[in-house]
């Protein structure tokens, strides 16, 4: 049997950094996906006593005997309950880390270890100790702020949960899960994100699982329904950033200049709320007029992010290039590098701006904003 699943990446449309200080932020799914294929061998097949993980886009393969996994991971039949998502204990995580170490990851790929640990945890908790080959490939650049780890957790969990769906209820082509299974999927994916990030907000996995857009403030997540098409150019600066240091820097600036930074955060809050209202609006306002308002909000948001100290010369280079083509851009996520969003109004031809950006060493993607969440296929 073969099961496929896919889950989208995400962008922060407005509110990054300020959300840590009580402001509203808006995030959206993008139509760049992580794909997971789950293949179960026939009982008579060779290697029906192994669990194999293939990372296609980085040409790596890992394989464990089921006997070794059972030996390493404490097994209690009562903990295997796909309908009750559970956290990975420190003890179990240490045991899983040993399994990962035994695979002799290349030094330059050690950043993959937490993702592989997450794979082993989710697989054994949801499926148990059954043989399979799991193939993962992704359209999302790793570590660029587009939610690649959450998309992995969501797509993997979707495939694992889908493997036990009755054949009678299976559809043809890509199909979404029902609300009950989506909620279960999102909870399991969040447990996976905790292994990778420690204390994630839950935003990335929620956007990836449900798709479309969400608004979040003070820990509360509200799903939004977009009523207008949005297309963005996403430019990866290829500059790595230290998210923790950037967040800390904004907090320190807020301590030094409390009144000024409070005004900045309040302004960002207003921008996020207005953006959410425009996107959800069902009034007769033309798409062109809405796009103009969104352009202005993005421009203001970028100015406020600059005042927080989280921009970077690479981000400013992208912005200057897109301005020459009469396009508006803002950083997305932590800043300090990472990715930049450029709004593409209806009818925009991007060939020339993409050519100019790529000639400067940047990586470009065009993406539709607010699309489908996790989907499965048989």
From Swiss-Prot:
Gene3D superfamilies found in the cross-reference section: 3.30.230.10, GHMP kinase, C-terminal domain (3.30.70.890)
> What PROSITE patterns does this protein's entry cite?
GHMP_KINASES_ATP
Alphabetical GO CC annotations of the entry are:
cytoplasm; cytosol
Location in the cell: Cytoplasm
Q: Which Pfam families match?
A: GHMP_kinases_C, GHMP_kinases_N
Q: Which family does it belong to?
A: Belongs to the GHMP kinase family. Mevalonate kinase subfamily.
Name the chain's protein: Mevalonate kinase
Q: Which organism is it from?
A: Arabidopsis thaliana
